[in-house]
Amino acid sequence: MRRGSGDAAVADAIERSKTTAARNIPQLPDLPLPEDTANLRLGPDLNNELLAVLPLVGVWRGEGEGHDPDTGDYPFGQQIIVSHNGGNYLKWESQTWVLDADGEYVRPDLHETGFWRISGDGIPGSTNEEVVELLLAHSSGIVELFYGQALTQSSWELATDVVIRSTSGVLVGGAKRLYGIVEGGDLAYVEERIIADGELRPHLSARLSRYVG
């Protein structure tokens, strides 16, 4: 890393927050429930059980690269919304869309929604160590349960424990995901997925900038 690049990244993040700090996800009125918020400055306090995944809260937008075993590599755009209402879970929604070689929209692609949860007592070395859970339902007709752990205060590694496919769902194997907050405060991730030959292969990767929070 070049000298001063860290300071520049912090300065960029501060400048960007002047816009993102005032934003939040839209709400419909007249419900007697705590409002969902993707901005830790607004709405209910984050549940103490979720401190291990606190940096994920926000709305993230950017571009990435996907790999299809049949058609090869392709670029995509993505938005991820991570919100909470004070409960002991984070709400997760991710949508991607295929881009052409010029970065223009082509069609919708992947859509998943679910919840991040934390189990265990958080005591290193105990028999009930802290575990990160991610439960996802996909528009492609599959449901997945990931288990993993926080590698640091701003990175998380997970792997599927269960993959359930509906009658009309796509045929896929298990997956591993690695998420992390990287230089400049962006959210980056990679996903590897088991394909027909039984090997884990690169499937998705992206770097997303904070849009809300």
Curated annotation (Swiss-Prot):
One of its GO terms (molecular function) is heme binding. Keywords: Heme, Iron, Isomerase, Metal-binding. Pfam families: THAP4_heme-bd. Its cofactor is heme b. Heme b binds at residues 176, 203. Heme-binding protein able to scavenge peroxynitrite and to protect free L-tyrosine against peroxynitrite-mediated nitration, by acting as a peroxynitrite isomerase that converts peroxynitrite to nitrate. Therefore, this protein likely plays a role in peroxynitrite sensing and in the detoxification of reactive nitrogen and oxygen species (RNS and ROS, respectively). Is able to bind nitric oxide (NO) in vitro, but may act as a sensor of peroxynitrite levels in vivo. HAMAP family: nitrobindin (MF_01297). Forms a 10-stranded antiparallel beta-barrel structure able to accommodate a hydrophobic ligand in its interior. In fact, this fold hosts the heme group, which is located in a wide surface cleft. Belongs to the nitrobindin family. This is Peroxynitrite isomerase 2. It comes from Rhodococcus jostii (strain RHA1).
